[in-house]
C-alpha cells in the first residue's frame, strides 16, 4: 500500500513539472527597447540668404528754391512727388544665430541690396508760365533718378511651429537699423522748351528698421536646413539729396544772397517685400 502511494505521488509531481514547463513556454517576453539618443536642440547656427525685392512705391517731398534776390530768395514751396518708387532687385544676407529649444531661436543678420529709384513731379504753374506753357495743363514735369544702397543690421526672433515630416514652418519678427546711401541724383525738366539738367549730391543716413517674416525650412540633413521665406521690411524716411550747384551759389544771374544749404528732398521711407532662399547650418 505504501509503495502504491509513493508511486502515485511521483506521477503527480512529474505531471505538475511538465505542466509548469509548458505554461512557461507559452509566456512571451516583451522586448525591451533602448531609448534612441535625441539630437541636441540648443546651439549656434550660421545662415546665408539670397532674395528678390519687389518694386516698392513710396513718397517724398522736395523744396523749390527761389534764386532771386532778397527778400524773395529762399524756399518758395514744398512739393510732394506724384510718383516715387524703388525698383526691384536682388538682396544678399548673412547671419549668426542661437537655437534655445525646438520652438525658439534668434539671430543677428546683415543684409544688402542696391536699387534704382525714380521720382516724378509736375512743374509748378509759375514754371510752366515762364516757359510760355498753359499753367493748368499737364505739359511739364521733373524727373529725378538715382540709385540707393541699403544695408540693414537686424536682431530677429523666430517661433518654429510643429513639424510636418521634414518641413518646419515658422514666424518671425525683427528690429534694427538701416543705412541708406544715395548716389548722385540727376534731375531733368521735361517740356517742349525746357533745358534744365542738374546733378544733386545724394545724402546718406541711419534709420530705424523693422521686419516681419514667415516661411518654412526643409531638413536636408539633421544639421543643414533649406530655408524658403518671405520678409516685409519697413525702413523709416530720411534725407534724399541736396541742392544743385546753381541753388547753392551766393551770386547768380538774378542777384546776390544766401545760397541754399542742407537737404532739398526727403523720402517717406520704404516698404520692401522680399522672397528669400537660404541655407542654415546648425552646430550640434
From Swiss-Prot:
UniProt keywords, alphabetically: Signal
Q: InterPro entries, from UniProt?
A: OMP/PagP_b-brl (IPR011250), OMP_b-brl (IPR027385)
What SUPFAM superfamilies is this protein classified in? OMPA-like
Q: Does the keyword Signal apply?
A: yes
Q: Where is the signal peptide?
A: 1-23
Asked if the record carries the keyword Signal, the reply is: yes
Report the family membership: Belongs to the surface antigen msp4 family.
Specify the protein name.
Uncharacterized protein BRA0921/BS1330_II0913
Amino acid at each position: 500500500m505504501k509503495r502504491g502511494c509513493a508511486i502515485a505521488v511521483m506521477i503527480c509531481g512529474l505531471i505538475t513539472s511538465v505542466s509548469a514547463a509548458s505554461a512557461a513556454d507559452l509566456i512571451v517576453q516583451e522586448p525591451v527597447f533602448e531609448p534612441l539618443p535625441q539630437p541636441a536642440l540648443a546651439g549656434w547656427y550660421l545662415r546665408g540668404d539670397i532674395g528678390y525685392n519687389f518694386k516698392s512705391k513710396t513718397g517724398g517731398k522736395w523744396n523749390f528754391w527761389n534764386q532771386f534776390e532778397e527778400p524773395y530768395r529762399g524756399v518758395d514751396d514744398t512739393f510732394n512727388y506724384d510718383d516715387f518708387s524703388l525698383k526691384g532687385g536682388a538682396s544678399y544676407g548673412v547671419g549668426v544665430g542661437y537655437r534655445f529649444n525646438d520652438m525658439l531661436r534668434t539671430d543677428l543678420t546683415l543684409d544688402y541690396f542696391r536699387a534704382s529709384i525714380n521720382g516724378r513731379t509736375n512743374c509748378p504753374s509759375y514754371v510752366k508760365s515762364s516757359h510760355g506753357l498753359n499753367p493748368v495743363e499737364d505739359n511739364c514735369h521733373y524727373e529725378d533718378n538715382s540709385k540707393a544702397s541699403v544695408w540693414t543690421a537686424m536682431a530677429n526672433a523666430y517661433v518654429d511651429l510643429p513639424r510636418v515630416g521634414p518641413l518646419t514652418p515658422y514666424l518671425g519678427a525683427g528690429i534694427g537699423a538701416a543705412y541708406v546711401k544715395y548716389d548722385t541724383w540727376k534731375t531733368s525738366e521735361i517740356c517742349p522748351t525746357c533745358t534744365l539738367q542738374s546733378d544733386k549730391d545724394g545724402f546718406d543716413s541711419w534709420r530705424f528698421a523693422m521686419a516681419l517674416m514667415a516661411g518654412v525650412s526643409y531638413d536636408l540633413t539633421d544639421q543643414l536646413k533649406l530655408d524658403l521665406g518671405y520678409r516685409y521690411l519697413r525702413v523709416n524716411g530720411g534725407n534724399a539729396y541736396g541742392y544743385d550747384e546753381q541753388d547753392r551759389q551766393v551770386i547768380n544771374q538774378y542777384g546776390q544772397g544766401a545760397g541754399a544749404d542742407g537737404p532739398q528732398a526727403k523720402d517717406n521711407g520704404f516698404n520692401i517685400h522680399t522672397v528669400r532662399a537660404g541655407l542654415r547650418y546648425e552646430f550640434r
